């Protein structure tokens, strides 16, 4: 179990074999759409992976892919063709993953980003709509995501171009040979620039937290005793936001405990040495045989 590095910082047990990082389901549908993702325990047992489609054998990056709820990835075209070859009266349990034989259709009560994307993709083909008891489409839409992405890009490009043209039309027309006194302009603008620059400065300089360099990248690295000692020493003597009297009382208490331990050790050693010397003294009052 680990922590995903996305802004949501969710705890997850899934691990990306290609990038070797913990990933949550939000990252699977956004940043790791074609990566091999399984549990971290599975990666510890066998870290080898194949970045090709199990159905056709070609690389996953060549075509559009889909991830099932078991996290196995296939080419959408290959998976669609395989499921279309099944009889029309196939039960929902008959549509299974070609790798692990888990059901393709996510349960109704399953709420996850991977399941939502899979439901959207399955709702665009007739064989899945037939199983889900939905009205059939006139024709399947295998290139829905590609078309939607392209149209969105064209729309954004047109919007950006129109906004740029409107901005340019609102600009003041300049003469071809205008002269600007840069010295006076800089001198007049420098107070405002200094004010804005100073406003961005933090009131209190915040230092990096202790152990900031020791993050998720090397949290599984085996540390030497020297590194452990240096880390705890920096934690003790580094400036912190806690009240100073806590640090003082901590040092005083630690010194008292150390002094008591030293006295106890010296007393124990002295008692042992004294017992040995007393045993060598000859007592004349005791009866003894001549």
UniProtKB/Swiss-Prot annotation:
Region listing for Disordered, in residue ranges: 156-175
Record's keyword annotation contains Zinc: yes
Source taxon at top rank: Eukaryota
PROSITE patterns from the UniProt entry: ZF_RING_2
Biased composition range(s): Polar residues: 156-168
PANTHER family xrefs: ZINC FINGER PROTEIN-LIKE 1
Record keywords: Membrane, Metal-binding, Transmembrane, Transmembrane helix, Zinc, Zinc-finger
ZnF (RING-type) intervals: 53-101
Zinc finger (B box-type): 1-43
Annotated signal peptide: none
Keyword Nucleotide-binding set for record: no
Protein name: Zinc finger protein-like 1 homolog
GO molecular function, one term: zinc ion binding
GO CC, alphabetical: Golgi apparatus; membrane
Gene3D superfamilies: Zinc/RING finger domain, C3HC4 (zinc finger) (3.30.40.10)
CDD domains: mRING-H2-C3DHC3_ZFPL1
Lineage: Eukaryota, Metazoa, Ecdysozoa, Arthropoda, Hexapoda
Subcellular location: Membrane
Membrane-crossing segments per the record: 249-269
Similarity-based family: Belongs to the ZFPL1 family.
Membrane topology: Single-pass membrane protein
């Amino acid at each position: 179990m680990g922590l995903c590095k996305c802004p949501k910082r969710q705890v997850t047990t899934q691990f990306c074999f290609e990038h070797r990082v913990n990933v949550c389901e939000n990252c699977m549908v956004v940043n790791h759409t074609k990566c091999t993702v399984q549990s971290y325990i599975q990666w510890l047992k066998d870290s080898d992976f194949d970045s090709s489609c199990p159905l056709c054998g070609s690389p996953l990056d060549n075509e559009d892919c889909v991830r099932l709820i078991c996290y196995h990835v296939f080419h959408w075209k290959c998976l669609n063709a395989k499921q279309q070859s099944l009889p029309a009266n196939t039960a929902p349990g008959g549509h299974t993953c070609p790798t692990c034989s888990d059901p393709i259709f996510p349960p109704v009560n399953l709420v996850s980003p991977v399941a939502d994307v899979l439901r959207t993709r399955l709702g665009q083909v007739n064989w899945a709509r037939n199983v889900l008891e939905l009205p059939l489409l006139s024709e399947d839409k295998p290139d829905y995501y590609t078309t939607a992405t392209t149209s969105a890009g064209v729309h954004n490009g047109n919007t950006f171009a129109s906004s740029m043209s409107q901005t340019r039309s609102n600009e003041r027309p300049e003469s071809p040979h205008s002269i600007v006194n840069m010295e006076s302009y800089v001198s007049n603008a420098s107070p405002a620039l200094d004010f804005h620059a100073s406003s961005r400065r933090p009131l209190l300089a915040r230092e990096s937290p202790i152990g900031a360099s020791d993050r998720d990248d090397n949290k599984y690295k085996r540390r030497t005793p020297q590194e452990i000692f240096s880390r705890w020493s920096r934690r003790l003597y580094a400036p912190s936001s806690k009240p100073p009297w806590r640090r003082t009382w901590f040092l005083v208490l630690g010194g008292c405990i150390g002094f008591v331990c030293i006295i106890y050790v010296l007393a124990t050693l002295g008692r042992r040495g004294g017992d040995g010397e007393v045993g060598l003294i000859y007592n004349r009052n005791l009866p003894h045989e001549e």
